[in-house]
Structures are given as C-alpha cells and as structure tokens.
UniProtKB/Swiss-Prot annotation:
Name listed for the protein in its UniProt record: Ferritin heavy chain
Residues in Ferritin-like diiron domain copies: 11-160
Reaction(s) catalysed by this chain's protein: 4 Fe(2+) + O2 + 4 H(+) = 4 Fe(3+) + 2 H2O
Protein's organism: Canis lupus familiaris
Residues modified to N-acetylthreonine: 2
Gene Ontology annotations of biological process type: immune response; intracellular iron ion homeostasis; iron ion transport; negative regulation of cell population proliferation; negative regulation of ferroptosis
PROSITE patterns xref list: FERRITIN_1 (PS00540), FERRITIN_2 (PS00204), FERRITIN_LIKE (PS50905)
Residue(s) carrying N-acetylmethionine: 1
Disulfide bonds listed in the record: none
Family: Belongs to the ferritin family.
InterPro entries recorded: Ferritin, Ferritin-like, Ferritin-like_diiron, Ferritin-like_SF, Ferritin_CS, Ferritin_DPS_dom
Length: 183
C-alpha cells in the first residue's frame, strides 16, 4: 500500500476542513442509508404505501449525490477522502408514515446543523471557496427539505395519522402521489 503523496493543487484548504468534509460525507451516506431503509419498509407487502416508498427512495438518492459532490470537492481541493463505517439506522421498523416523516425531519435538521458547523469552520479558516460551495449546493436545499418534511408531518397529523390508516393511504395517494408533478 502506498501512502498518499502531497497534493499539487491544495491551496488555502485547512486540515480541519478536510476532516470535517470527510465527516460530512459519512453523515450524508448515513442519511442515504436511513432513507433507503424507510423506502423498502414502505414497499413491504404488509405496509404497501408505494408513494412513501418512492419518496424515501428519491431522498436516499439525493443524499448519496450530496456525499458524491463532497467527495468531488475533496479531490478538487487537494484533500484526501477517508471513508468511515456507515452506522446502521436506529430502527428497521418505521411503524407508520407519520413516524417516518418525523424521523426524516429530525435527520434533515441534524444534517443541516452539521453543514452550518462546517460553514462556520470554513469561515473561521478564511476559506471563501468552501463557504460558497456549502451555500450554493447545500444550505438552501436543506431549508427547503426541512420545510417540506415539516409540512408533511403537519398534514399527516391534521388527517388523524397515525391512528387513522385511511389518513396515510390518502396522503400516500394524493400528496406523495402527485409530488412528481410539482418540484
């Protein structure tokens, strides 16, 4: 095994930023893994909420893309990618749509907090490129995602979820089923 040679392209890229990017990559991959678990839970024959499954599968792919974008940045800046083990989701049974949406909301807020801390680190290390990258590619999208999930949680509660199975069915069919046409 060869040791990594020093980068020719590295400039104004602090080691703390490099390490924080590697941690963010892991967090984005973890989020992707959680959403993948949610997707296939809702795809089960005894749950059968196909639009919840599609929604969470889409979220999983987005989180993986976020990780890949950070990997590309790491290479562009002359950093080195060090992947860590991805923690398994805290549960395998997501119980119902409301619970899954609440967990997703909590997850997105955690990812957002980590991005805000990464932005602060980049500011402290006087790295305008990293600040701009995070602002351009992540922060606005996180805020939109948090708002969307918050709206979903509110609407599911208003419809009587989780006590009413009909609420989840209607939400799956009419809200998530029509989301392909919006975005």
């Amino acid at each position: 095994m060869t040791t990594a040679s020093p980068s020719q392209v590295r400039q104004n890229y602090h080691q703390d930023s490099e390490a924080a990017i590697n941690r963010q990559i892991n967090l984005e991959l973890y989020a992707s893994y959680v959403y993948l678990s949610m997707s296939y839970y809702f795809d089960r024959d005894d749950v059968a909420l196909k639009n919840f499954a599609k929604y969470f599968l889409h979220q999983s792919h987005e989180e993986r893309e976020h990780a890949e974008k950070l990997m590309k940045l790491q290479n562009q800046r002359g950093g080195r990618i060090f992947l860590q083990d991805i923690k398994k989701p805290d549960r395998d049974d997501w119980e119902n749509g409301l619970n899954a949406m609440e967990c997703a909301l909590h997850l997105e807020k955690s990812v957002n907090q980590s991005l805000l801390e990464l932005h602060k680190l980049a500011t402290d290390k006087n790295d305008p490129h990293l600040c701009d990258f995070i602002e351009t590619h992540y922060l606005n999208e996180q805020v939109k995602s948090i708002k969307e999930l918050g709206d979903h949680v509110t609407n599911l509660r208003k419809m009587g979820a989780p006590e009413s199975g009909m609420a989840e069915y209607l939400f799956d069919k009419h809200t998530l089923g029509n989301s392909d046409n919006e975005s």
